[in-house]
Amino acid sequence: MELELAEGSYDLRLWTDYAHADNPLADTFYHTESLKAVTIVTKPYTANTDAKDAAYYNKSDITLAEEGATMNVQLQRPLAKYRLIAKDVENYRKLMEAKPDIYPPLKNLTVKVLYEGYFPSGFNVSTGKPNDAVSGISYSQVSLHYNDVDNEVLLGGDWVLVNGTESLVNVTVTVTDNLGNTLCRASGVQINYRNSHLTTVYGNFLTGGINKGGVDINTEWNGIYNVWF
């Protein structure tokens, strides 16, 4: 990037994210009118894509001489990523075989992930920290992709704005058939996350409601958290 600037002292703030090739200046996943208040696009809200990855840079009091200068900057990621994986595909297949009129093929299921409480929605490039949150955010995954030999299936995933410390969000994961009937619901699923790390949460998302004797689950979540550095 090349800038024409007069001699003096400057503050440099940068934000980079993905844009559509046919309209590169339009905001796609983040509103970037102000770098002190970068906010996620919530209408519509989009998840299940790595195109939400982004990076920023902030440095104050940069002295620029009359002859100019060349700077190399190291961008930082203000995000953490997580994914939800159902580990009970084989148990669900058994339910399909026993009651095919109730339990449709995996490709006919819809998964909805609802963030419980507030979800980080804003980021201040000048401080390197989230600065806003909203409630009522959710996303859906329609038609699960898997092979007949798979024992696990990816239900969904998202990126979360973070600072330099660990934090968490709680979600409700609801699985429905193509008629909207609820087959399983797991609430209070805690997702721990950390900047530039991937958190993978495994659980009985497809059959947990059956094994617990009902559809709704509102107990302590016993999932497994794997973090890759």
Task: Report the location of each language-model feature.
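Tryptophan-paired
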Residues: M1-D27, K94-R194, G223-F229
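Short, low-hydrophobicity acidic/polar segments
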Residues: M1-K81
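Residues at beta-strand starts and edge strands
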Residues: G8-Y10, A69, P78-A80, K107, ...
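Residue-level marker of positions within ordered structural domains that often coincide
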Residues: A19, V89, V201
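Low-complexity, Pro/Ser/Thr- and charge-rich linker/hinge segments at domain boundaries
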Residues: I40-T49, R194-L206
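Structural motif
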Residues: I85-E97
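Intrinsically disordered, low-complexity repeat and linker tracts
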Residues: N204-F229
